[in-house]
Design a protein with these regions (language model features):
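N-terminal capping/small domains of soluble enzymes
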Residues: 2-124, 129-131
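Short, conserved acidic/polar surface loops in the N-terminal third of protein domains
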Residues: 72-76, 101, 136-139, 164-166
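Glycine-rich beta-strand-to-loop/alpha-helix junction loops that act as flexible
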Residues: 40, 154-157
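Alpha-helix N-cap and loop-to-helix initiation/capping positions
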Residues: 167-174
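Conserved small/polar residues in nucleotide/adenosyl-binding loops
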Residues: 176-178
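Residues at the N-termini of beta-strands
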Residues: 60, 150-151
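Catalytic cores of alpha/beta
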Residues: 47-52, 134-146
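Conserved radical SAM core fold
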Residues: 67-72, 156-165
Length: 178
């Protein structure tokens, strides 16, 4: 991405330099200081890792999957070691959209404000899942009540229980409705 790119509608992210290389990238209208993003499910809600890694050093991160209501996830055992590696079955455990907006997002907003003072940014993307189209709509409506989420990642691999357990991801019409 060139800094003089006339299609750029957003202020470019603060560059991260590696051996003099500008690492900035732009994707789907978002600017990232580098292409390193922590994937959903690997980084909790982000706030848990602030003491380990400065979030403003990442290009961004995707918070673990959020649903309209909290979910306890699967009962133990959730992990099993095999000769081929680890298997897990967490079951999409999460605190729910409302608790995320009330408990986690204010902390992320504070970290974003702190980063902005250093002319850095923290790009937060929320992973959203549901079992019906209405679940996705309602979850995003609740998350939109807060500030600081740059984009949504739709987890369309959850079973659509209203339609015989078919996942949205495998159904082109279902994906289009989401």
């Amino acid at each position: 991405m060139s800094q003089s790119d006339p299609t750029q509608t957003q202020k470019p992210a603060t560059p991260t330099r590696f051996s003099g290389t500008d690492m900035r990238v732009s994707f789907a209208g978002l600017s990232f200081k580098n292409p390193i993003l922590a994937a959903s499910g690997t980084f909790g809600y982000g706030v848990e890792f602030e003491d380990i890694v400065s979030l403003d050093r990442l290009g961004g991160f995707v918070v673990k999957g959020l649903s309209r209501e909290s979910m306890p996830g699967n009962p133990p055992p959730r992990m099993f070691e095999t000769a081929a590696g680890m298997l897990n079955s967490i079951g999409l455990q999460n605190i729910g959209a409302r608790a995320f907006v009330e408990e986690k997002l204010p902390v992320l907003n504070m970290l974003q404000a702190k980063a902005a003072k250093k002319k850095h940014d923290i790009v937060v993307i929320a992973n959203v899942f549901g079992y019906t189209t209405k679940d996705y709509e309602e979850t995003i409506r609740i998350l939109n009540e807060g500030e600081g989420i740059a984009a949504y990642e739709l987890n369309v691999s959850c079973p659509n229980t209203k339609h015989g357990g078919i996942s949205f991801g495998g159904d082109q019409i279902g994906r289009a409705h989401v």
